[in-house]
Amino acid sequence: MSTSSESALSVFGAGDINNAAYVRSIIRQGRWTSHTSGLASEHVQGNVVILPADEANDFLRYCQRNPKPCPLLAVSEPGHAGLPTLGADLDIRTDLPRYRVWRHGEVVDEPADISALWRKDLVTFVIGCSFSFEEALMQAGLPLRHIEQQRNVAMYRSNIATEPAGAFHGPMVVSMRPFKASDAIRAIQITSRFPDVHGAPVHMGDPAQIGIADLARPDYGDAVEVLPDEIPVFWACGVTPQAAIAQARPEFCITHAPGAMLITDLLNHQLAAF
């Protein structure tokens, strides 16, 4: 079983770490249970929310009303564990490194396999993830500190409200990456090309303006240092639905664990708008 400090190369091997189907197969075997930042870097990654069918319509409307933090990549039929538009062999019950099981708005377990919990009424939503634009940032020569340090990205609950739908409501969660000023401008330009994976940032600069008191204490993920000559840049984040689930308190729900994403067969460049 992997840990966040263990090198991905020691588990996957240098030759296969960029092969999405191979990475999913290792995850399916339970050999990698950590975050997926930097894995299969050419491939689209997704946040996951799994809800009973009787609550799926409200959540679908929540995503439609909040496309910045909740850009939908795929929605399954009730009870279907496959998502053929995202991967031919994909099985949502086994192919995430770690899941969160929710009951009445509280996380009660974080298993690596949800096969025993699967039900015929469950609907899967896959939401775009900012890990998918990191390849473009790195190709442009922009440093990403969490990848350099083999950490999960830092994520925070902001004071930016989302548009409610049914019982689903709550604050926008944002991910943060520090850049020097010139690199921050370039990062805005690059990520604007990817609206299906959150697009351009929602804020840069003073974190207090969006309700973040201490960058060293993220609500999800791992803290990274922001150097004196750097600016924190914040993107809408697909963990936002988990904040909404905590407010809606559905009887039963499953999500990905923050940072432990679904790796798809889609290529990042396929989502570029221009």
Swiss-Prot record:
Keyword Lyase (UniProt): yes
The keyword Transcription appears for this protein:
no
The UniProt keyword set, sorted, is:
Lyase
Against InterPro entries, the record matches this protein to: D-Glu_cyclase, Putative_hydro-lyase, UPF0317
- Give the Pfam families listed for this entry: D-Glu_cyclase
S-S pairs: none
This entry's Enzyme Commission designation comes to 4.2.1.-
Tell me a Gene Ontology molecular-function term this record carries: lyase activity
Regarding protein family, the annotation reads: Belongs to the D-glutamate cyclase family.
Q: Which PANTHER family is this protein grouped with?
A: D-GLUTAMATE CYCLASE, MITOCHONDRIAL
Family annotation (NCBIfam families): PRK05463.1
Mind telling me what this protein is named? Answer: Putative hydro-lyase Bpro_1776
Native organism is Polaromonas sp. (strain JS666 / ATCC BAA-500)
